[in-house]
Amino acid sequence: MEYIRITSIHDPLFVKMHELMKEVFPPEEVLEFELWKEPLEDSGIRVFAAVHEGDVVGATEYRYYPEWNIAMTDFTIIGRQGLSIGRFLAGNRSKDLTELTRQNGKELFGMFAEIYDPYGIEDHEFGGAKPMNPFVRREVLSHMGYKKLDFPYLHPSWKNDGEAVKGLDFCFMPADEEITEIHAELVINFLTEYYSVLSAKPQDWYTMIEQLKEKEYISLLPL
């Protein structure tokens, strides 16, 4: 299996990856094909495909923020079972992030991720891909060290239509397992930057940010 970076919408691997995304994720979570042009060309956004016998069987997108020394996993797709794709993607992502933080002269503080709460949503099929079942994924991510940030979370739809997307928890995986809380300012700054690409945001999102500004720290809870 190969771990191949994708930097253009014209890459045939991206066509396959985008089709895989549409099979696996709900429509509001998938950015339109043409809108991927700038993100893929952005050196700070790292999109990799797991390629097996010419097919894209998995993919991951993540980014490193040197100013905060944190990372964000945008998504991880496991499109086929029985190939240890999840382990393959996580291992290669970790190696890449270790090198990026080394270049920054630091060790990674931690990594954010949005994780589905399957206990609060009805549709669990995710394109019928068994490894993508939200119940399974949530437990695996908990095993990896992710913890739930203690506040009710929503995010703007990637359709950029101003709708709020719920049914997820905003989570953080600290490099130091002893950490039980993080600065609210870090969360606010990160979310503001992360969703700055979307011009249409729901009022509920702005309200969430304002409520976070009233906090100094946000607790990390078991996932």
What function would you assign to each model-found segment?
Residues 2, 6-9, 102-223:
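Terminal substrate-recognition subdomain of acyl/acetyltransferases
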Residues 38-49, 106, 163:
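A short helix-loop-beta-strand connector motif used in the catalytic cores of GNAT acetyltransferases and
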Residues 64-73, 81, 106-109:
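A conserved beta-turn-beta hairpin within the catalytic core of GNAT-like acetyltransferases
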Residues 82-99, 108:
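Conserved acetyl-CoA-binding loop-helix of GNAT-fold acetyltransferases
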Residues 1-35, 51, 56:
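Short amphipathic alpha-helix that is part of the acyltransferase structural core
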Residues 75-84, 117:
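A short, internal acetyl-CoA/4′-phosphopantetheine-binding micro-motif in the GNAT/acyltransferase core
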Residues 59-61, 88, 99-103, 110-112:
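Hydrophobic, well-ordered beta-alpha structural blocks that scaffold small-molecule cofactor pockets
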Residues 49, 55-63, 70-77:
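Conserved beta-strand in the GNAT
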